[in-house]
Amino acid sequence: MSSTKSDFEIIREYIIGDGKDISVGKAPEGNVRLEITHSVLTGESLGTNNFKNFSLDLKIKDFKEKLYRFVGTEPKYMELILRDENKVNDICKIDDDDDKTLGSYEPKDGMNVHIIDKDPNNFVSELQDISKAPKPVISEEDYNKREGTYKKWKEENQLKKENDTTATTVTATTTTTNNATDTEIEIKVGDRCKVISDDPTNYDERLGKVQYVGTVEFSSGVWIGVELDLPLGKNDGSVKGKQYFQCSPKYGCFAKPKNVLVGDYPEEEI
């Protein structure tokens, strides 16, 4: 019996992707998209997105500095191995000639750079095991009396979101494309923004620019079309053959207004 996808699954695939490896996306011209792994740090420690874009003209000494900011291993203690996308075959060792460029090693999108930490004083692996660390114990009643806690912040933030939604005064038909019904929002085309997840445990966020605000054919209500800074999207501004805005493949995504935060965000780079 053939299985069919629900409307929710279809919409989810168009908005946030269909679960494929994000290394499939191509880096912008003149860049390469590489997966970063570490001999000590686990994948959980590095985060869910350890694929990063790098300029092919980047000198190795500058490449190491960027890796240092990502993993915390000092450049002088790094040994870098370029591996295939399956992380099985070593292609070459990235030597210590800091004036060479990353492009001179001919890396391809999806390949892996594995960092071997040679620091003799490294104790990061011990820090990753928190099972034996002492944990403070406090009753829920005492915790609720405290100010400045995460719980208080979350409650205040949620209340602020609800108030902002209620108090919005800009009509969509005056600030959006294609008649976004009478829903009132404050997001307009050209705004810099951050796309966030509904999942409170998912801290991934994507930066970009609003390119479309309005109704869509694939779902009800108002949707925000965003051109992302990095190829972490699903589409090119079109869904099911309908073009809502123009952008490169994998740079487009759609989100509900509540998942789009407008602000003076700088263009995203590693």
Swiss-Prot record:
The keyword Glycoprotein does not apply. Binds to alpha-tubulin folding intermediates after their interaction with cytosolic chaperonin in the pathway leading from newly synthesized tubulin to properly folded heterodimer. Belongs to the TBCB family. The gene is tbcb. Its main location: cytoplasm. One of its GO terms (biological process) is tubulin complex assembly. CDD domains: Ubl_TBCB. Keywords: Chaperone, Cytoplasm, Cytoskeleton, Microtubule. Supercomplex made of cofactors A to E. Cofactors A and D function by capturing and stabilizing tubulin in a quasi-native conformation. Cofactor E binds to the cofactor D-tubulin complex; interaction with cofactor C then causes the release of tubulin polypeptides that are committed to the native state. Pfam families: CAP_GLY (PF01302), Ubiquitin_2 (PF14560). SMART domains: CAP_GLY. The keyword Cytoplasm applies. GO terms for molecular function: alpha-tubulin binding; microtubule plus-end binding. One of its GO terms (cellular component) is microtubule plus-end. This is Tubulin-specific chaperone B. It is found in: Cytoplasm; Cytoplasm, Cytoskeleton. Residues 214-256 form the CAP-Gly domain. InterPro entries: CAP-Gly_dom_sf, CAP-Gly_domain, TBCB_Ubl, Ubiquitin-like_dom, Ubiquitin-like_domsf.
